[in-house]
Amino acid sequence: MELENIVANSLLLKARQGGYGKKSGRSKKWKEILTLPPVSQCSELRHSIEKDYSSLCDKQPIGRRLFRQFCDTKPTLKRHIEFLDAVAEYEVADDEDRSDCGLSILDRFFNDKLAAPLPEIPPDVVTECRLGLKEENPSKKAFEECTRVAHNYLRGEPFEEYQESSYFSQFLQWKWLERQPVTKNTFRHYRVLGKGGFGEVCACQVRATGKMYACKKLQKKRIKKRKGEAMALNEKRILEKVQSRFVVSLAYAYETKDALCLVLTIMNGGDLKFHIYNLGNPGFDEQRAVFYAAELCCGLEDLQRERIVYRDLKPENILLDDRGHIRISDLGLATEIPEGQRVRGRVGTVGYMAPEVVNNEKYTFSPDWWGLGCLIYEMIQGHSPFKKYKEKVKWEEVDQRIKNDTEEYSEKFSEDAKSICRMLLTKNPSKRLGCRGEGAAGVKQHPVFKDINFRRLEANMLEPPFCPDPHAVYCKDVLDIEQFSVVKGIYLDTADEDFYARFATGCVSIPWQNEMIESGCFKDINKSESEEALPLDLDKNIHTPVSRPNRGFFYRLFRRGGCLTMVPSEKEVEPKQC
Protein backbone atom coordinates (compact mmCIF):
# COMPACT_ATOMS: atom_id res chain seq x y z
CA MET A 1 0.00 0.00 0.00
CA GLU A 2 1.10 3.55 -0.72
CA LEU A 3 0.21 4.57 2.86
CA GLU A 4 2.56 1.95 4.32
CA ASN A 5 5.43 3.27 2.22
CA ILE A 6 4.71 6.89 3.21
CA VAL A 7 4.68 5.98 6.91
CA ALA A 8 7.90 3.95 6.61
CA ASN A 9 9.68 6.76 4.76
CA SER A 10 8.41 9.41 7.19
CA LEU A 11 9.73 7.51 10.20
CA LEU A 12 13.10 7.00 8.51
CA LEU A 13 13.44 10.65 7.48
CA LYS A 14 12.49 11.83 10.97
CA ALA A 15 15.13 9.53 12.48
CA ARG A 16 17.78 10.72 9.98
CA GLN A 17 17.05 14.32 10.94
CA GLY A 18 17.36 13.58 14.67
CA GLY A 19 13.64 13.73 15.33
CA TYR A 20 13.56 11.72 18.55
CA GLY A 21 14.83 13.19 21.79
CA LYS A 22 16.53 16.51 22.45
CA LYS A 23 20.02 15.35 21.47
CA SER A 24 19.84 14.43 17.78
CA GLY A 25 18.05 11.12 18.15
CA ARG A 26 19.53 10.06 21.48
CA SER A 27 17.37 8.03 23.82
CA LYS A 28 16.11 9.80 26.95
CA LYS A 29 18.21 7.26 28.82
CA TRP A 30 21.40 7.75 26.84
CA LYS A 31 23.44 8.65 29.93
CA GLU A 32 22.34 5.47 31.67
CA ILE A 33 23.26 3.42 28.62
CA LEU A 34 26.71 5.07 28.43
CA THR A 35 27.47 5.04 32.15
CA LEU A 36 31.23 4.64 32.57
CA PRO A 37 32.45 2.17 35.20
CA PRO A 38 34.65 3.08 38.19
CA VAL A 39 38.34 2.90 37.30
CA SER A 40 38.74 0.09 39.83
CA GLN A 41 36.49 -2.02 37.61
CA CYS A 42 38.99 -1.65 34.74
CA SER A 43 42.02 -3.14 36.52
CA GLU A 44 41.92 -6.39 34.54
CA LEU A 45 41.62 -4.43 31.28
CA ARG A 46 44.59 -2.27 32.32
CA HIS A 47 46.81 -5.35 32.48
CA SER A 48 45.42 -7.23 29.48
CA ILE A 49 45.25 -4.44 26.89
CA GLU A 50 48.13 -4.44 24.40
CA LYS A 51 50.43 -1.47 25.14
CA ASP A 52 50.91 -0.48 21.52
CA TYR A 53 51.57 3.26 21.05
CA SER A 54 50.36 3.37 17.45
CA SER A 55 47.04 1.71 18.27
CA LEU A 56 46.31 3.37 21.61
CA CYS A 57 47.52 6.89 20.83
CA ASP A 58 47.05 7.35 17.10
CA LYS A 59 44.67 4.90 15.41
CA GLN A 60 41.94 4.68 18.06
CA PRO A 61 40.04 8.01 18.01
CA ILE A 62 39.27 8.26 21.74
CA GLY A 63 42.78 7.10 22.63
CA ARG A 64 44.25 9.67 20.25
CA ARG A 65 42.14 12.44 21.77
CA LEU A 66 42.97 11.56 25.39
CA PHE A 67 46.69 11.15 24.65
CA ARG A 68 46.68 14.63 23.14
CA GLN A 69 44.91 16.01 26.20
CA PHE A 70 47.65 14.44 28.31
CA CYS A 71 50.34 15.99 26.08
CA ASP A 72 48.69 19.41 26.45
CA THR A 73 49.59 19.35 30.15
CA LYS A 74 53.33 19.25 29.35
CA PRO A 75 54.85 22.06 27.20
CA THR A 76 57.45 19.84 25.49
CA LEU A 77 54.92 17.19 24.52
CA LYS A 78 52.40 19.82 23.44
CA ARG A 79 55.06 21.24 21.12
CA HIS A 80 55.51 17.84 19.46
CA ILE A 81 51.76 17.48 18.91
CA GLU A 82 51.59 20.97 17.39
CA PHE A 83 54.42 20.00 15.03
CA LEU A 84 52.66 16.80 13.94
CA ASP A 85 49.43 18.75 13.33
CA ALA A 86 51.31 21.31 11.24
CA VAL A 87 52.83 18.53 9.11
CA ALA A 88 49.34 17.04 8.61
CA GLU A 89 48.20 20.43 7.24
CA TYR A 90 51.27 20.57 4.99
CA GLU A 91 50.45 17.17 3.49
CA VAL A 92 47.02 18.34 2.28
CA ALA A 93 48.17 21.79 1.10
CA ASP A 94 47.68 22.75 -2.54
CA ASP A 95 50.72 22.07 -4.73
CA GLU A 96 51.48 25.75 -5.28
CA ASP A 97 51.39 26.48 -1.53
CA ARG A 98 53.31 23.45 -0.32
CA SER A 99 56.83 24.93 -0.35
CA ASP A 100 55.88 28.07 1.60
CA CYS A 101 53.83 26.01 4.04
CA GLY A 102 56.74 23.63 4.69
CA LEU A 103 59.32 26.39 5.16
CA SER A 104 57.04 28.17 7.62
CA ILE A 105 56.86 24.94 9.66
CA LEU A 106 60.66 24.78 9.80
CA ASP A 107 60.82 28.42 10.86
CA ARG A 108 58.15 27.86 13.50
CA PHE A 109 59.63 24.76 15.11
CA PHE A 110 63.36 24.69 14.28
CA ASN A 111 64.45 28.32 14.47
CA ASP A 112 67.62 28.71 16.58
CA LYS A 113 66.05 31.65 18.41
CA LEU A 114 63.12 29.61 19.70
CA ALA A 115 62.74 29.16 23.43
CA ALA A 116 61.10 25.74 22.93
CA PRO A 117 62.67 23.92 19.94
CA LEU A 118 62.37 20.19 19.22
CA PRO A 119 65.83 18.88 20.18
CA GLU A 120 64.78 15.25 19.68
CA ILE A 121 64.81 15.75 15.90
CA PRO A 122 68.50 15.84 14.74
CA PRO A 123 69.75 18.93 12.82
CA ASP A 124 70.85 16.84 9.83
CA VAL A 125 67.28 15.52 9.42
CA VAL A 126 65.97 19.10 9.51
CA THR A 127 68.59 20.22 6.98
CA GLU A 128 67.66 17.44 4.55
CA CYS A 129 64.01 18.38 4.94
CA ARG A 130 64.79 22.04 4.22
CA LEU A 131 66.65 21.14 1.02
CA GLY A 132 63.72 19.06 -0.17
CA LEU A 133 61.30 21.93 0.42
CA LYS A 134 63.36 24.26 -1.78
CA GLU A 135 62.88 22.02 -4.81
CA GLU A 136 60.47 23.13 -7.53
CA ASN A 137 57.81 20.57 -6.58
CA PRO A 138 58.46 19.50 -2.97
CA SER A 139 57.26 16.05 -2.00
CA LYS A 140 54.23 15.57 0.20
CA LYS A 141 56.46 13.27 2.25
CA ALA A 142 59.17 15.87 2.91
CA PHE A 143 58.61 15.66 6.68
CA GLU A 144 58.36 11.86 6.77
CA GLU A 145 61.65 11.35 8.66
CA CYS A 146 60.90 14.23 11.04
CA THR A 147 57.51 12.79 11.97
CA ARG A 148 59.02 9.32 12.41
CA VAL A 149 61.53 10.71 14.92
CA ALA A 150 58.79 12.68 16.71
CA HIS A 151 56.60 9.59 17.08
CA ASN A 152 59.57 7.51 18.26
CA TYR A 153 60.14 10.08 21.00
CA LEU A 154 56.45 10.07 22.04
CA ARG A 155 56.27 6.26 22.12
CA GLY A 156 59.04 6.19 24.73
CA GLU A 157 58.92 7.84 28.15
CA PRO A 158 55.89 10.08 27.34
CA PHE A 159 53.82 6.98 26.48
CA GLU A 160 54.85 5.32 29.75
CA GLU A 161 53.87 8.44 31.72
CA TYR A 162 50.55 8.57 29.90
CA GLN A 163 49.75 5.03 31.06
CA GLU A 164 50.08 6.18 34.68
CA SER A 165 47.84 9.23 34.17
CA SER A 166 44.12 9.79 34.75
CA TYR A 167 43.75 10.26 30.97
CA PHE A 168 44.68 6.63 30.36
CA SER A 169 42.26 5.61 33.11
CA GLN A 170 39.52 7.46 31.25
CA PHE A 171 40.50 5.63 28.08
CA LEU A 172 40.16 2.29 29.89
CA GLN A 173 36.67 3.28 31.04
CA TRP A 174 35.65 3.91 27.44
CA LYS A 175 37.26 0.62 26.33
CA TRP A 176 35.27 -1.19 29.03
CA LEU A 177 32.08 0.39 27.70
CA GLU A 178 33.07 -0.46 24.13
CA ARG A 179 33.34 -4.14 25.05
CA GLN A 180 29.85 -4.48 26.52
CA PRO A 181 27.41 -6.88 24.79
CA VAL A 182 25.45 -5.67 21.76
CA THR A 183 21.88 -6.86 21.14
CA LYS A 184 18.96 -5.87 18.93
CA ASN A 185 17.82 -3.59 21.77
CA THR A 186 20.95 -1.47 21.24
CA PHE A 187 19.12 -0.10 18.17
CA ARG A 188 15.83 1.25 16.91
CA HIS A 189 14.87 -0.44 13.64
CA TYR A 190 13.26 1.21 10.62
CA ARG A 191 12.21 0.33 7.07
CA VAL A 192 13.78 -2.24 4.78
CA LEU A 193 16.24 -0.65 2.35
CA GLY A 194 17.01 -3.66 0.19
CA LYS A 195 17.96 -7.32 0.22
CA GLY A 196 21.12 -9.37 -0.10
CA GLY A 197 21.92 -13.01 -0.66
CA PHE A 198 21.13 -14.16 2.87
CA GLY A 199 18.59 -11.60 4.08
CA GLU A 200 17.33 -8.04 4.10
CA VAL A 201 18.99 -4.73 4.89
CA CYS A 202 17.12 -2.20 7.02
CA ALA A 203 17.91 1.19 8.52
CA CYS A 204 18.64 1.33 12.23
CA GLN A 205 19.63 3.91 14.83
CA VAL A 206 21.78 3.52 17.95
CA ARG A 207 19.59 4.46 20.91
CA ALA A 208 22.43 5.92 22.95
CA THR A 209 23.88 8.24 20.30
CA GLY A 210 21.24 8.69 17.60
CA LYS A 211 23.72 7.51 14.94
CA MET A 212 22.07 5.99 11.85
CA TYR A 213 23.36 2.76 10.30
CA ALA A 214 22.31 0.06 7.84
CA CYS A 215 21.70 -3.35 9.42
CA LYS A 216 22.42 -6.29 7.14
CA LYS A 217 20.56 -9.30 8.52
CA LEU A 218 21.84 -12.72 7.48
CA GLN A 219 19.22 -15.37 8.21
CA LYS A 220 20.79 -18.24 10.14
CA LYS A 221 18.76 -20.97 8.44
CA ARG A 222 19.42 -19.54 4.97
CA ILE A 223 23.17 -19.43 5.70
CA LYS A 224 23.11 -23.04 6.87
CA LYS A 225 21.03 -24.24 3.91
CA ARG A 226 23.41 -22.66 1.39
CA LYS A 227 26.54 -23.59 3.39
CA GLY A 228 27.43 -19.91 3.53
CA GLU A 229 29.16 -19.83 6.92
CA ALA A 230 32.65 -19.28 5.49
CA MET A 231 31.41 -16.58 3.10
CA ALA A 232 29.55 -14.70 5.86
CA LEU A 233 32.47 -14.87 8.27
CA ASN A 234 34.89 -13.84 5.52
CA GLU A 235 32.84 -10.71 4.73
CA LYS A 236 32.62 -9.83 8.41
CA ARG A 237 36.37 -10.21 8.99
CA ILE A 238 37.29 -8.17 5.90
CA LEU A 239 34.88 -5.37 6.87
CA GLU A 240 36.34 -5.41 10.37
CA LYS A 241 39.89 -5.22 9.05
CA VAL A 242 39.47 -2.44 6.48
CA GLN A 243 39.26 1.12 7.81
CA SER A 244 38.77 3.28 4.74
CA ARG A 245 36.83 6.43 3.98
CA PHE A 246 35.92 4.82 0.65
CA VAL A 247 34.66 1.42 1.87
CA VAL A 248 31.62 0.90 4.09
CA SER A 249 32.68 0.39 7.72
CA LEU A 250 31.51 -2.32 10.09
CA ALA A 251 30.53 -0.79 13.44
CA TYR A 252 28.79 -3.71 15.21
CA ALA A 253 28.30 -7.45 14.74
CA TYR A 254 25.66 -9.21 16.84
CA GLU A 255 23.13 -12.02 16.67
CA THR A 256 19.43 -12.48 17.29
CA LYS A 257 17.50 -15.72 17.59
CA ASP A 258 17.07 -15.94 13.82
CA ALA A 259 19.80 -13.79 12.25
CA LEU A 260 23.41 -12.66 12.27
CA CYS A 261 23.58 -8.89 11.94
CA LEU A 262 26.23 -6.61 10.43
CA VAL A 263 25.70 -2.95 11.33
CA LEU A 264 27.31 -0.87 8.57
CA THR A 265 27.75 2.70 7.40
CA ILE A 266 24.39 3.92 6.11
CA MET A 267 24.54 5.49 2.66
CA ASN A 268 21.46 7.65 2.25
CA GLY A 269 22.23 8.81 -1.30
CA GLY A 270 21.39 5.56 -3.10
CA ASP A 271 23.63 3.57 -5.46
CA LEU A 272 25.32 4.59 -8.70
CA LYS A 273 23.03 2.38 -10.77
CA PHE A 274 20.02 4.41 -9.63
CA HIS A 275 21.75 7.69 -10.41
CA ILE A 276 23.10 6.56 -13.80
CA TYR A 277 19.76 5.29 -15.12
CA ASN A 278 16.93 6.95 -13.19
CA LEU A 279 17.76 10.66 -13.08
CA GLY A 280 17.62 12.24 -16.53
CA ASN A 281 19.58 10.86 -19.47
CA PRO A 282 21.70 7.76 -18.71
CA GLY A 283 25.22 8.53 -17.53
CA PHE A 284 27.05 11.45 -15.90
CA ASP A 285 29.05 14.37 -17.17
CA GLU A 286 32.75 13.55 -17.25
CA GLN A 287 33.70 15.71 -14.25
CA ARG A 288 31.32 13.79 -12.00
CA ALA A 289 32.44 10.42 -13.36
CA VAL A 290 36.12 11.30 -12.82
CA PHE A 291 35.45 12.37 -9.21
CA TYR A 292 33.78 9.04 -8.41
CA ALA A 293 36.57 7.19 -10.23
CA ALA A 294 39.17 8.98 -8.09
CA GLU A 295 37.38 7.94 -4.89
CA LEU A 296 37.06 4.37 -6.18
CA CYS A 297 40.79 4.37 -6.90
CA CYS A 298 41.44 5.37 -3.27
CA GLY A 299 39.10 2.64 -2.02
CA LEU A 300 40.80 -0.04 -4.12
CA GLU A 301 44.18 1.19 -2.89
CA ASP A 302 43.03 0.81 0.73
CA LEU A 303 41.76 -2.70 0.04
CA GLN A 304 44.95 -3.71 -1.75
CA ARG A 305 47.03 -2.34 1.12
CA GLU A 306 45.38 -5.11 3.18
CA ARG A 307 45.95 -7.54 0.25
CA ILE A 308 42.22 -7.76 -0.51
CA VAL A 309 40.80 -8.15 -4.03
CA TYR A 310 37.17 -7.01 -4.24
CA ARG A 311 36.01 -8.80 -7.44
CA ASP A 312 32.53 -7.30 -7.76
CA LEU A 313 32.80 -3.69 -8.95
CA LYS A 314 29.48 -2.64 -10.48
CA PRO A 315 27.24 0.43 -10.12
CA GLU A 316 24.78 -1.11 -7.62
CA ASN A 317 27.64 -1.86 -5.21
CA ILE A 318 28.84 1.76 -5.12
CA LEU A 319 26.81 3.86 -2.68
CA LEU A 320 26.55 7.61 -2.06
CA ASP A 321 26.48 9.20 1.39
CA ASP A 322 24.61 12.35 2.48
CA ARG A 323 27.26 14.66 1.01
CA GLY A 324 27.69 12.77 -2.26
CA HIS A 325 30.91 10.87 -1.52
CA ILE A 326 30.99 7.21 -2.57
CA ARG A 327 31.88 4.00 -0.74
CA ILE A 328 32.37 0.45 -1.94
CA SER A 329 29.82 -1.92 -0.37
CA ASP A 330 28.93 -5.63 -0.29
CA LEU A 331 32.26 -7.38 0.23
CA GLY A 332 30.77 -10.88 0.07
CA LEU A 333 32.97 -11.89 -2.89
CA ALA A 334 36.14 -10.18 -1.66
CA THR A 335 39.05 -12.33 -0.58
CA GLU A 336 42.43 -11.82 1.06
CA ILE A 337 45.46 -12.88 -0.99
CA PRO A 338 48.49 -14.15 0.95
CA GLU A 339 51.77 -12.39 0.18
CA GLY A 340 53.44 -13.82 -2.92
CA GLN A 341 50.42 -15.90 -3.93
CA ARG A 342 47.62 -15.68 -6.48
CA VAL A 343 44.02 -16.88 -6.37
CA ARG A 344 41.64 -18.45 -8.86
CA GLY A 345 37.87 -18.13 -8.95
CA ARG A 346 35.19 -17.36 -11.52
CA VAL A 347 33.27 -14.97 -9.29
CA GLY A 348 31.65 -11.62 -9.96
CA THR A 349 28.78 -10.29 -12.08
CA VAL A 350 28.22 -11.05 -15.77
CA GLY A 351 29.45 -8.15 -17.87
CA TYR A 352 31.95 -6.89 -15.28
CA MET A 353 34.27 -9.88 -14.84
CA ALA A 354 37.79 -9.49 -16.25
CA PRO A 355 39.02 -11.84 -19.03
CA GLU A 356 41.31 -13.68 -16.60
CA VAL A 357 38.32 -14.33 -14.30
CA VAL A 358 36.14 -15.51 -17.20
CA ASN A 359 38.97 -17.85 -18.27
CA ASN A 360 39.34 -19.13 -14.68
CA GLU A 361 43.02 -18.11 -14.57
CA LYS A 362 45.00 -17.13 -11.48
CA TYR A 363 45.20 -13.44 -10.55
CA THR A 364 45.90 -10.95 -7.76
CA PHE A 365 44.35 -7.47 -8.00
CA SER A 366 43.96 -7.16 -11.79
CA PRO A 367 40.16 -7.86 -11.83
CA ASP A 368 39.52 -4.73 -9.78
CA TRP A 369 41.34 -2.43 -12.20
CA TRP A 370 39.32 -3.98 -15.03
CA GLY A 371 36.18 -3.34 -12.96
CA LEU A 372 37.19 0.30 -12.51
CA GLY A 373 37.49 0.62 -16.29
CA CYS A 374 33.99 -0.84 -16.72
CA LEU A 375 32.59 1.62 -14.19
CA ILE A 376 34.23 4.70 -15.71
CA TYR A 377 32.94 3.66 -19.14
CA GLU A 378 29.40 3.08 -17.84
CA MET A 379 29.27 6.34 -15.86
CA ILE A 380 30.12 8.33 -18.99
CA GLN A 381 28.44 6.31 -21.76
CA GLY A 382 25.29 5.26 -19.89
CA HIS A 383 25.75 1.51 -20.32
CA SER A 384 28.47 -1.03 -19.58
CA PRO A 385 31.17 -1.63 -22.22
CA PHE A 386 30.09 -5.15 -23.20
CA LYS A 387 26.35 -5.21 -22.50
CA LYS A 388 23.80 -2.46 -23.04
CA TYR A 389 21.30 -1.58 -20.32
CA LYS A 390 18.46 -4.16 -20.19
CA GLU A 391 19.85 -5.94 -23.26
CA LYS A 392 18.56 -9.53 -23.51
CA VAL A 393 21.67 -11.63 -24.06
CA LYS A 394 23.01 -14.92 -22.69
CA TRP A 395 25.93 -14.79 -20.29
CA GLU A 396 28.02 -16.94 -22.65
CA GLU A 397 27.71 -14.24 -25.32
CA VAL A 398 28.75 -11.52 -22.85
CA ASP A 399 31.80 -13.59 -21.85
CA GLN A 400 32.80 -13.90 -25.51
CA ARG A 401 32.51 -10.14 -25.96
CA ILE A 402 34.72 -9.55 -22.92
CA LYS A 403 37.39 -11.90 -24.28
CA ASN A 404 37.31 -10.83 -27.93
CA ASP A 405 35.55 -7.51 -28.57
CA THR A 406 36.90 -3.96 -28.29
CA GLU A 407 34.67 -1.42 -26.58
CA GLU A 408 33.32 1.49 -28.64
CA TYR A 409 33.54 5.17 -27.64
CA SER A 410 31.10 7.96 -28.43
CA GLU A 411 31.55 11.73 -28.44
CA LYS A 412 30.75 11.71 -24.71
CA PHE A 413 34.37 10.71 -23.99
CA SER A 414 37.28 13.15 -23.90
CA GLU A 415 40.65 11.86 -25.10
CA ASP A 416 41.81 11.42 -21.49
CA ALA A 417 38.65 9.48 -20.61
CA LYS A 418 39.12 7.22 -23.63
CA SER A 419 42.75 6.70 -22.68
CA ILE A 420 42.13 5.56 -19.10
CA CYS A 421 39.28 3.26 -20.13
CA ARG A 422 41.43 1.62 -22.81
CA MET A 423 44.35 1.19 -20.41
CA LEU A 424 42.11 -0.32 -17.70
CA LEU A 425 40.19 -2.52 -20.15
CA THR A 426 43.33 -4.08 -21.62
CA LYS A 427 42.66 -7.81 -22.10
CA ASN A 428 46.15 -8.87 -20.98
CA PRO A 429 46.33 -8.25 -17.20
CA SER A 430 50.13 -7.92 -17.24
CA LYS A 431 49.78 -4.87 -19.54
CA ARG A 432 46.77 -3.34 -17.77
CA LEU A 433 47.06 0.00 -15.97
CA GLY A 434 47.51 -0.66 -12.25
CA CYS A 435 48.95 -4.14 -12.85
CA ARG A 436 52.41 -3.26 -14.16
CA GLY A 437 54.02 -2.86 -10.76
CA GLU A 438 52.82 0.69 -10.12
CA GLY A 439 49.49 -0.20 -8.48
CA ALA A 440 47.07 2.56 -7.51
CA ALA A 441 49.82 5.19 -7.66
CA GLY A 442 50.14 4.62 -11.40
CA VAL A 443 46.40 4.92 -11.93
CA LYS A 444 46.29 8.17 -9.94
CA GLN A 445 48.95 9.67 -12.19
CA HIS A 446 46.81 9.33 -15.32
CA PRO A 447 46.04 12.74 -16.94
CA VAL A 448 42.30 12.26 -16.44
CA PHE A 449 42.91 12.96 -12.72
CA LYS A 450 45.02 16.09 -13.29
CA ASP A 451 42.51 18.29 -11.41
CA ILE A 452 42.19 15.91 -8.42
CA ASN A 453 44.29 16.59 -5.31
CA PHE A 454 44.33 13.05 -3.91
CA ARG A 455 45.73 14.11 -0.52
CA ARG A 456 42.82 16.48 -0.02
CA LEU A 457 40.40 13.89 -1.38
CA GLU A 458 41.65 11.29 1.10
CA ALA A 459 41.32 13.87 3.91
CA ASN A 460 37.65 14.48 2.96
CA MET A 461 38.44 18.07 1.98
CA LEU A 462 37.00 18.10 -1.56
CA GLU A 463 33.34 18.82 -2.28
CA PRO A 464 31.56 16.24 -4.46
CA PRO A 465 30.00 17.42 -7.75
CA PHE A 466 26.55 16.17 -6.68
CA CYS A 467 24.76 16.24 -3.30
CA PRO A 468 21.75 13.94 -2.73
CA ASP A 469 18.44 15.42 -1.62
CA PRO A 470 18.30 15.06 2.20
CA HIS A 471 14.49 14.72 2.05
CA ALA A 472 14.52 11.84 -0.43
CA VAL A 473 14.66 8.09 0.24
CA TYR A 474 16.79 6.60 -2.55
CA CYS A 475 15.48 3.03 -2.55
CA LYS A 476 12.53 1.00 -3.77
CA ASP A 477 9.13 1.25 -2.11
CA VAL A 478 8.75 -1.10 0.85
CA LEU A 479 6.31 -3.41 -0.94
CA ASP A 480 8.43 -3.49 -4.11
CA ILE A 481 11.32 -5.15 -2.24
CA GLU A 482 10.79 -8.86 -2.66
CA GLN A 483 10.52 -10.74 0.62
CA PHE A 484 12.41 -13.95 1.35
CA SER A 485 10.49 -17.19 1.52
CA VAL A 486 10.51 -19.24 4.70
CA VAL A 487 13.40 -21.72 4.89
CA LYS A 488 12.01 -25.19 5.59
CA GLY A 489 13.72 -28.38 6.69
CA ILE A 490 16.71 -26.64 8.29
CA TYR A 491 17.25 -26.81 12.05
CA LEU A 492 19.78 -24.93 14.16
CA ASP A 493 21.65 -26.83 16.86
CA THR A 494 24.50 -26.41 19.34
CA ALA A 495 27.06 -27.22 16.63
CA ASP A 496 26.23 -23.87 15.03
CA GLU A 497 26.92 -21.90 18.21
CA ASP A 498 30.71 -21.79 17.71
CA PHE A 499 30.24 -20.09 14.34
CA TYR A 500 27.77 -17.60 15.81
CA ALA A 501 30.18 -16.78 18.64
CA ARG A 502 32.98 -16.03 16.16
CA PHE A 503 30.64 -13.79 14.19
CA ALA A 504 28.84 -11.85 16.93
CA THR A 505 31.79 -9.97 18.46
CA GLY A 506 30.03 -6.70 19.35
CA CYS A 507 31.51 -3.26 18.74
CA VAL A 508 34.36 -2.54 16.31
CA SER A 509 36.78 -0.17 18.03
CA ILE A 510 37.51 2.62 15.54
CA PRO A 511 33.95 3.11 14.16
CA TRP A 512 32.46 2.90 17.67
CA GLN A 513 34.88 5.46 19.07
CA ASN A 514 34.25 7.75 16.10
CA GLU A 515 30.53 7.44 16.79
CA MET A 516 31.02 8.49 20.42
CA ILE A 517 33.02 11.56 19.34
CA GLU A 518 30.92 12.61 16.33
CA SER A 519 27.63 12.26 18.22
CA GLY A 520 28.94 14.51 21.02
CA CYS A 521 28.51 11.79 23.66
CA PHE A 522 32.25 11.70 24.39
CA LYS A 523 32.35 15.46 24.87
CA ASP A 524 29.27 15.45 27.09
CA ILE A 525 30.54 12.68 29.35
CA ASN A 526 34.29 13.26 29.42
CA LYS A 527 35.33 15.38 32.39
CA SER A 528 38.18 17.02 30.47
CA GLU A 529 35.78 18.47 27.89
CA SER A 530 32.76 19.26 30.06
CA GLU A 531 31.83 20.15 33.61
CA GLU A 532 30.24 16.77 34.28
CA ALA A 533 32.18 14.55 36.64
CA LEU A 534 33.49 11.15 35.60
CA PRO A 535 33.41 8.18 37.99
CA LEU A 536 37.20 8.10 38.25
CA ASP A 537 36.96 6.38 41.68
CA LEU A 538 40.61 5.54 42.10
CA ASP A 539 39.85 4.12 45.56
CA LYS A 540 38.95 0.48 45.04
CA ASN A 541 36.90 0.48 48.25
CA ILE A 542 34.52 3.16 46.97
CA HIS A 543 31.52 1.85 45.11
CA THR A 544 29.12 3.85 42.98
CA PRO A 545 25.52 3.27 44.10
CA VAL A 546 23.14 2.01 41.45
CA SER A 547 20.31 4.49 40.91
CA ARG A 548 16.81 3.04 41.01
CA PRO A 549 13.82 4.49 39.22
CA ASN A 550 11.08 6.17 41.28
CA ARG A 551 8.21 3.79 41.98
CA GLY A 552 4.58 4.91 42.24
CA PHE A 553 2.10 4.24 45.04
CA PHE A 554 0.39 1.29 43.32
CA TYR A 555 3.74 -0.32 42.52
CA ARG A 556 4.75 -0.22 46.20
CA LEU A 557 1.31 -1.46 47.28
CA PHE A 558 1.33 -4.51 44.99
CA ARG A 559 5.02 -5.12 45.68
CA ARG A 560 4.26 -5.61 49.37
CA GLY A 561 1.53 -8.06 48.40
CA GLY A 562 3.99 -10.13 46.38
CA CYS A 563 2.15 -9.51 43.13
CA LEU A 564 5.07 -7.99 41.30
CA THR A 565 8.58 -9.10 40.44
CA MET A 566 11.40 -6.62 39.97
CA VAL A 567 11.81 -5.57 36.34
CA PRO A 568 13.47 -2.51 34.89
CA SER A 569 11.10 0.37 34.22
CA GLU A 570 10.90 1.61 30.67
CA LYS A 571 9.47 5.10 30.44
CA GLU A 572 10.27 5.86 26.84
CA VAL A 573 8.23 4.44 24.04
CA GLU A 574 9.82 4.99 20.65
CA PRO A 575 8.63 4.22 17.12
CA LYS A 576 9.79 0.96 15.65
CA GLN A 577 9.56 0.27 11.95
CA CYS A 578 11.21 -2.55 10.03
Swiss-Prot record:
Top-level taxon of the source organism: Eukaryota
What's in the keyword line of the UniProt record? Acetylation, ATP-binding, Cytoplasm, Kinase, Lipoprotein, Nucleotide-binding, Palmitate, Phosphoprotein, Serine/threonine-protein kinase, Transferase
Q: How is its activity regulated?
A: Inhibited by heparin.
**Residue ranges occupied by any RGS domain in the UniProt entry:** 52-172
Biological process GO annotation list? receptor internalization; regulation of G protein-coupled receptor signaling pathway; regulation of opsin-mediated signaling pathway; regulation of signal transduction; signal transduction
Ranges where the AGC-kinase C-terminal domain occurs? 450-515
Q: Which InterPro entries does the UniProt record give?
A: AGC-kinase_C, GPCR_kinase, Kinase-like_dom_sf, Prot_kinase_dom, Protein_kinase_ATP_BS, RGS, RGS_sf, RGS_subdomain_2
Localization in the cell: Cytoplasm; Cytoplasm, Cell cortex
Signal peptide span per the entry?
A: none
Tissue distribution is:
Isoform 1, isoform 2, isoform 3, and isoform 4 are expressed in testis. Isoform 4 is expressed in myometrium.
GO CC terms: cell cortex; cytoplasm; cytosol; photoreceptor disc membrane; plasma membrane
Main localization of the protein described in the UniProt heading: cytoplasm
Q: Which residues carry this modification: N-acetylmethionine?
A: 1
Describe the reaction catalysed, as an equation. Answer: [G-protein-coupled receptor] + ATP = [G-protein-coupled receptor]-phosphate + ADP + H(+)
GO molecular function (one): ATP binding
**Region described as N-terminal: spans on this chain:** 1-154
Give the quaternary structure: Interacts with DRD3.
Q: What is the purpose of this protein?
A: Specifically phosphorylates the activated forms of G protein-coupled receptors. GRK4-alpha can phosphorylate rhodopsin and its activity is inhibited by calmodulin; the other three isoforms do not phosphorylate rhodopsin and do not interact with calmodulin. GRK4-alpha and GRK4-gamma phosphorylate DRD3. Phosphorylates ADRB2.
Name of the protein described by the UniProt record = G protein-coupled receptor kinase 4
Q: Which organism is this protein's natural source?
A: Homo sapiens (Human)
